[in-house]
Amino acid sequence: MITEDEVNKLLSENEALFRFMGAKFEKIERGVAKLSFEYKEELSRIGGMLHGAIIFAAMDYSGSYAVRTLDVKEAYTLEFNVIFLKAMKTPPFTFLARVVRETKRYAYVEVEGFDGNNELCAKGNGIWHLIRD
């Protein structure tokens, strides 16, 4: 299985958005991925809160790498929904993704977004299409 360091290196070298966000995976294990990053003004919207698009991106990254631990060749997000519960203002921002159900071709994932006070600020869920060998 790919390690946190390998994923962080791969994405930092190849994905400008991941690099721009300053994101780092703290934990990757079968069916689980945890991502975090600090506050940057460039990631915020008016009012100093984390922009919804950045929250969505963090959830998609987290969910995608939770899914990639399932012995798949590739995986694609088919659908993803986010509920914004509370403004994310206090860093660090942490996103925890868990695969809830896996079939031969699909995975259902839930992702939670927390602020630096460990308060739940966003909840997401999605379906990924799995490509196996």
Swiss-Prot record:
Keywords: Hydrolase. GO terms for molecular function: fatty acyl-CoA hydrolase activity. Pfam families: 4HBT (PF03061). Belongs to the thioesterase PaaI family. The keyword Hydrolase applies. It comes from Sulfurisphaera tokodaii (strain DSM 16993 / JCM 10545 / NBRC 100140 / 7) (Sulfolobus tokodaii). This is Putative esterase STK_17900. Its EC number is 3.1.2.-.
